A protein has these predicted regions:
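Catalytic Walker B motif of ABC-type/P-loop ATPase nucleotide-binding domains
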Residues: 161-164
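Conserved ABC transporter NBD signature motif
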Residues: 64-77
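Conserved ABC ATPase "signature" region
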Residues: 114-132
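Conserved ABC ATPase signature
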Residues: 136-140, 144
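H-loop (His-switch) and adjacent beta-strand-loop-beta switch element
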Residues: 209-222
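H-loop/switch region of ABC-family ATPase nucleotide-binding domains
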Residues: 196-197
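Helix N-cap at the start of a conserved alpha-helix in ABC-type nucleotide-binding domains
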Residues: 172-174
Length: 245
C-alpha cells in the first residue's frame, strides 16, 4: 500500500486496532493530504468506526501511530458521530448545541467570547439552520438534526471533518441534501474523511477510498474502480457500473 506523507495532514502508520485480545484491523497505513475527500467503506463490524475513534484519540491503537501534519492540531478536527436515540432526544436548543462546538477554543474559560458566538451563527447560516436557533433539537427532522451537528463540528475546525455515516436513517431527499452540503464544504478547502456503507456515493464524491475488509485497499477513486482486487469491492462496483471489473 503506497502513500506519500510529504504534504499529509494525517498519517496513520502500521495501525493494529481491536478490543482486548481481538484484533480487527492489522497493519493499516495511509495518509490524507489537505483537500482530500476520503471515504472509508467496508462491511459492518470491519472496524471503520474504531479507526475513526482512534484517529480522534478516543481509542488507543494496539500498536502503530496516528500523526498530524501541515499545521493541523489534534483538537482542530471536527467530528460528526453516528446519531443515537439519546442524541436525537437531547433536550437542548439548536443554538446551545452548535455553540458547544466551540468548547475546545475556550480552554479554562467558563464562557464563550463574542467571536465564538459569531462563528457559531456563521456556521448555522452556512448550514441553513439560523432560523432554527431557538428550536429544541429533539423537535427537528432527522435532516435538520444532522445539519445542526455538522454546524457544531464546523465550530471546531475549518481544516478537517470526520463524518461517521452522516446520512444513515435519513430519507433519500435529506441524504442528497447532506451529500451536497458536505461536497460544498470540501470544495471550500476542508478535508473530509467520511465513513459510508454506500459505495455508490463514495465513488460520486470521493477523491480517495479506503476499503476495510478481508483485504485492505487504499488509493484514489480511479485506482479503486480499476485496480482493486477485493472481491466484495468488485461485486459492488459491478452493480454500480454494470460491467465486469
Amino acid at each position: 500500500m503506497c502513500y506519500n506523507t510529504a504534504m499529509a495532514q494525517l498519517i496513520c502508520k502500521d495501525l493494529i486496532l481491536g478490543y482486548e485480545s481481538k484484533i480487527i484491523i492489522k497493519k493499516l497505513s495511509f495518509a490524507v493530504n489537505a483537500g482530500d475527500y476520503l471515504c472509508i467503506v467496508g462491511e459492518n463490524g470491519s472496524g471503520k468506526t474504531t479507526l475513526m475513534k482512534t484517529i480522534l484519540g478516543l481509542l488507543k491503537p494496539i500498536s502503530g501511530t496516528v500523526e498530524t501534519g501541515e499545521g493541523l492540531l489534534p483538537d482542530e478536527i471536527g467530528y460528526l458521530p453516528q446519531q443515537t436515540f439519546v442524541q436525537k432526544d437531547f433536550p437542548a436548543s439548536v443554538w446551545e448545541i452548535v455553540l458547544s462546538g466551540c468548547q475546545s477554543r475556550c480552554g479554562c474559560r467558563p464562557f464563550y467570547k463574542k467571536e465564538e458566538k459569531k462563528l457559531a451563527m456563521q456556521n448555522m447560516q452556512k448550514m441553513g439552520i439560523a432560523h432554527l436557533a431557538r428550536r429544541c433539537y429533539r423537535e427537528l427532522s432527522g435532516g435538520q438534526q444532522q445539519r445542526v451537528l455538522l454546524a457544531r463540528a464546523l465550530c471546531a475546525t475549518q481544516k478537517m471533518l470526520l463524518l461517521d455515516e452522516p446520512v444513515s436513517a435519513l430519507d433519500p431527499g435529506a441524504q442528497e441534501e447532506m451529500y451536497t452540503l458536505i461536497e460544498k464544504l470540501h470544495k471550500s478547502g476542508i478535508t473530509v474523511i467520511m465513513i459510508s456503507h454506500d459505495i455508490d456515493a463514495s465513488l460520486r464524491f470521493a477523491t480517495h477510498v479506503l476499503h476495510i475488509g478481508k483485504e485492505i485497499f487504499y488509493g484514489t477513486k480511479d485506482e479503486f474502480v480499476h485496480k482493486s482486487t477485493c472481491p466484495d469491492c468488485n461485486g459492488q462496483i459491478r452493480k454500480i457500473f454494470g460491467r465486469k471489473i
